[in-house]
Each structure stands twice: as C-alpha cells, then as structure tokens.
Amino acid sequence: QPMGWQTPIIVLCAHLNLLENDRERQYEVIQDYISKEIDADTPLILAGDFNDWKKMSSRKLGEKLHLQEALFTHHGKLLPTFPARLPLLSLDRIYVRNLQVKRAWVNTGYPWSSLSDHLPISAEVCPLPNS
C-alpha cells in the first residue's frame, strides 16, 4: 500500500507466449483470475510483455475487465517497444483499473536499449478522485 493511500494496489506481471493460440488461453486465465480473485473496486495494475502483435489484449482483457492501457490513455496511441534498438512494434502494456494515469512513457536510449530485447515502459498513477 503506497504511503498516504487509503487502499492497497494489486500489481500483476505477465509475459504471454508468442503463439496466438497460447495467448488466447492465457487471456482467459488472466481474465478468470482477475474476475474471481480481485474485487472490482480494488486498484489494479496488470503489466508486462503481452507479445501483442495484433493489438488484441485491449479487447480481450481491457474491455472485459474495465482496464485502461496507460500509454494509450496518456498518448492516444500505443508506443513501440520492440525491438529495443529500433522499436517498431507495440508488444508491451501497462493496464490499470481504478487508478488515474498521470504520465506514461517508454524508457529509451542507453542503458534501456541494451538491457533487453524490449524497451521498458513506465507509468505514474494516482488514486482516482474521491478514492
């Protein structure tokens, strides 16, 4: 629970498979877990490498679970994160629920481009007003 916040945040990290059929099953498992185990009013962050070549995770998870994608919320579009040295594809996501996205960005340049095959993404969030 962040200092000064009235409620804890649940943070989940995901790394989905490259194969679409596997990702479909993983979407179902993630959706089932969040629906059954996390109260709909609890602040939630779901982030990671979704290997989302076809940009399906927003529809498969976002709409069904009322999640907002942080980069899209802040910039009006998804930003490329892969490959790190010359990013062309948007494979990584930070989804939030019951949180306000203040800022969201892709960490670029050195050392970020040399640490992984993906550029890391970050978001600054705060409680929703009246939370």
Residue locations for each model-derived region?
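Active-site regions of metal-assisted phosphoester/phosphodiester hydrolases
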Residues: 1-131
